[in-house]
C-alpha cells in the first residue's frame, strides 16, 4: 500500500510540474512550430490565389479550352496550353525512365556493395553534381551533349526503333529526348542521395535474416532491403518528379522551344516552365500576360496534383503492406 501511495504521489507531482508556469517555454515552442507549419500552408494558398487573380480574365475568356487547344498566337490573342503540358509531362517521363533505375542502382551499390575506399568519393561526386547550376548544365547540353546525341545515339535509335512513331522522322539536335536527358542528369543526384539515406535506414536485422536463410548478397539486397524500403524509394522518385516538372533553365536551352505535339522524341518541344522563362518579358498585352499567369497556374496545379497522388499511393502501399503483415 505504501508503494502504491508513493507512486500516486509521484504521478501527481509530475502532472503538477507539467501544468506549472515553468512549462511556458514548452507551450511557446509548441505554438511557434504550429505557426511555422501553418505559415507554409498559408504561403501555398497565397501563391495559388495570386496566380488565380493574375489569370482570371484569361480563365473567363478561354475556360477549359485553354487546357485542350494547341494554338499559341500572341498576335491574335489565341492561347492554348496543351503543347506545353504535353512537353512537360513527356520530358519528365523520359527523365524518370532514365534517372530512376540509375539512381536506385547507384544507391544500392553505395549502401550494400561498395567498399569504403570508393564509397565516399562517389558520394562526394554525386553531391557535387547536384550543386552544379542548371545554366551550366544547359551550356554543357548545348555544346557537348546535343552534338554527341545527334551524331551517335540518335541515329542508332532511329535504325533500331525507327519503325515506331517515337523514333521516326528527321533527327534534330534540340529535342524532347534531349530535354528529358538533361532533366535526368539534374534529378539523378537528388533521387540517389535520398534513396541512399532510405536504404541506410533499413534495419540490419532484415539483411541478417536474409543471409540466415541462405540468400546471396543480391537476393538479400533485392528481397530484404529494396522490398523493405519501397515506400521510401517511391517518395524519393516523387521528389525527383517534382524537380523535373519545374526545371526551367537547362531544359529551355536544349528542348527546342517549339509549341507542338509530336509523337517523335527527335522533334523539338516546349514545357510550361520554359514558356514562362522565355515569354514573360515579351508579354506586351494584358491578355498575353494573363495567359502566361494561367500557364503558371497550370504548372502549380500539376505539381500539387502529383504530390497529392503520391501521398495517396504511399498510403495505399502502407495499408497493403500492413495487411500482408497481419495475414
Regions found by a protein language model. Name each.
Residues 95-126, 310-319:
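Transmembrane-helix boundary motif in ABC transporter permease subunits
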Residues 60-79, 139-185:
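Membrane-interfacial helix termini and adjacent extracytoplasmic/periplasmic loops
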Residues 86, 90-98, 102, 106, ...:
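Hydrophobic alpha-helical transmembrane segments of multipass integral membrane proteins
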Residues 13-27, 31-32, 51-95, 115-116, ...:
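Periplasmic/extracellular loop-to-transmembrane helix junction in inner-membrane transport proteins
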Residues 251-301:
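Interhelical loop and adjacent transmembrane-helix boundary motif
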Residues 196-200, 204, 211, 281-327:
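C-terminal transmembrane helix and the adjacent membrane-cytosol boundary/short C-terminal tail
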Amino acid at each position: 500500500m505504501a508503494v502504491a501511495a508513493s507512486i500516486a504521489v509521484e504521478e501527481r507531482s509530475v502532472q503538477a510540474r507539467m501544468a506549472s508556469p515553468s512549462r511556458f517555454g514548452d507551450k511557446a515552442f509548441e505554438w511557434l512550430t504550429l505557426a511555422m507549419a501553418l505559415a507554409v500552408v498559408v504561403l501555398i494558398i497565397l501563391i495559388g490565389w495570386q496566380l488565380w487573380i493574375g489569370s482570371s480574365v484569361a480563365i473567363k475568356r478561354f475556360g477549359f479550352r485553354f487546357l485542350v487547344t494547341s494554338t499559341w498566337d500572341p498576335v491574335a490573342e489565341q492561347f492554348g496550353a496543351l503543347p506545353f503540358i504535353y512537353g512537360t509531362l513527356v520530358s519528365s517521363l523520359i527523365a524518370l525512365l532514365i534517372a530512376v533505375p540509375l539512381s536506385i542502382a547507384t544507391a544500392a551499390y553505395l549502401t550494400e556493395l561498395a567498399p569504403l575506399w570508393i564509397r565516399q568519393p562517389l558520394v562526394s561526386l554525386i553531391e557535387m553534381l547536384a550543386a552544379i547550376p542548371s545554366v551550366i548544365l544547359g551550356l554543357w547540353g548545348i555544346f557537348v551533349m546535343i552534338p554527341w546525341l545527334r551524331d551517335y545515339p540518335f541515329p542508332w535509335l532511329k535504325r533500331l526503333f525507327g519503325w515506331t512513331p517515337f523514333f521516326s522522322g528527321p533527327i534534330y539536335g534540340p529535342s524532347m529526348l534531349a530535354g528529358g536527358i538533361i532533366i535526368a542528369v539534374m534529378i539523378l543526384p537528388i533521387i540517389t542521395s535520398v534513396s541512399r539515406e532510405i536504404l541506410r535506414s533499413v534495419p540490419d536485422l532484415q539483411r541478417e535474416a536474409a543471409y540466415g536463410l541462405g540468400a546471396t548478397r543480391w537476393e538479400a539486397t533485392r528481397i530484404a532491403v529494396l522490398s523493405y524500403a519501397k515506400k521510401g524509394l517511391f517518395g524519393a522518385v516523387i521528389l525527383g518528379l517534382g524537380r523535373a516538372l519545374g526545371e526551367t533553365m537547362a531544359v529551355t536551352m536544349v528542348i527546342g522551344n517549339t509549341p507542338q505535339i509530336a509523337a517523335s522524341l527527335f522533334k523539338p518541344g516546349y514545357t510550361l516552365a520554359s514558356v514562362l522563362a522565355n515569354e514573360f518579358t515579351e508579354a506586351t498585352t494584358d491578355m498575353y500576360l494573363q495567359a502566361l499567369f494561367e500557364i503558371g497556374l497550370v504548372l502549380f496545379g500539376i505539381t500539387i496534383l502529383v504530390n497529392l497522388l503520391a501521398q495517396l499511393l504511399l498510403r495505399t502501399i502502407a495499408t497493403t503492406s500492413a495487411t500482408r503483415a497481419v495475414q
